[in-house]
Amino acid sequence: MERRDFFKKALTVAGTAAVGSTTTEAAQTVHPVDNRKVSDIAFPQKRPLITYSDRPPLLESPREVFTSALTPNDLFFVRWHLPIIPTYINPRKFSVKVDGAVKNEIKISLHTLKTEFKAVEVTAVLQCGGNSRTAFKPTTSGIQWGVGAMGCAKWKGVRLKDVLQKAGLADGATWVGFNGEEKAVYNETSDFIREIKIAEIHDDIILAYEMNGEDLPYLNGYPLRLVLPGVYSDSWIKMLSHITVTKERQKLHFMDHAYRIPDNDCECETPDNLAAKTKPIEEMNVNSLIGYPQTGTKVKQGAELIVRGIAFDGGHGIKTVQISIDSGATWNDAKLDDGSQGKYAYRAFSYKLKLTESGTLSILCKASNEKGEEQPFPQDIKWNHGGYKYNGIDKVTVEVVA
């Protein structure tokens, strides 16, 4: 299929069918994932995923995906914010514009990015700030994601630094904003624009055109997206087409009112006493997840069960992953992979369990990082109105049968 015609196909095959059919029992698999069902209708370039919406596309990866350091492209979650996505993209004509407080306003074609700039790779976790939002009680606003609004990929592209150097920064340039091709239905609705400080730009921030050795999947931002390793995905702008450099921070809806948490020591509030002062969500918390087994898995008494999963943080580095089978009274170290994918990537882990007794068995995992941070128990996580940055100790419950 031509990439530029992708979404016409998607709207026909997935859009009209997914929402119209996945509400019926016949259109869902019997494959529960944390009490959620994977649709049996797949979007193009994707295997069946947990579907929340087709416009904009909101697709969650099933728990079973999280057993290796890299997430396959066709199982990678999808999160768009605005409902209108181009149905036609011609890669030969696509370009990204750089303007604002620069010495030279420029437009750089996709071809030029690929042929005239140094190509670099970075492996990094992409995670929605609202991942696992459904765990917050009372329920918060936003998509009620389960555990799978995240993935890890090897991204290839060009350094943001190099693109800005090509344009040349004007004196006093302080901020840089990013806008993509997703649009709202009404003109009054703000574009989804995110900003970062120029002083915080480092070599691992790239404009990516490849994901796991292939062109970006259409639903993951083809043909170009911003990659900001270590921070939540709200700023990883998809279908990136416009970069604006400014001397002052702009007034932007999606910076001023969205993806923000209480600006206090606990980053917390209560439904009856919302925080007056807030700050953007940025660096990811230390986190881990069991990919296998899953809740409801049946295993044979006397067998050896290998627990597998992943751990990550905002780039400080995972130090340990530990497993408990006694509700957290005691913990044992899992085996971590060699970490060769880099500090922003998943660390895959494994742990061998000998199943000596039949019955229900709960398995917990928690990660710690080199900064000294450790996952808390779910009951110790403080509430915030957006349901952001959840990183509670993970648990699955299996049945050991004689």
Features from the language model and the residues they span:
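Extended, aromatic/histidine-rich regions of cofactor-dependent oxidoreductases associated
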Residues: E2-V96, V102-I108, F117-A119, Q165-A402
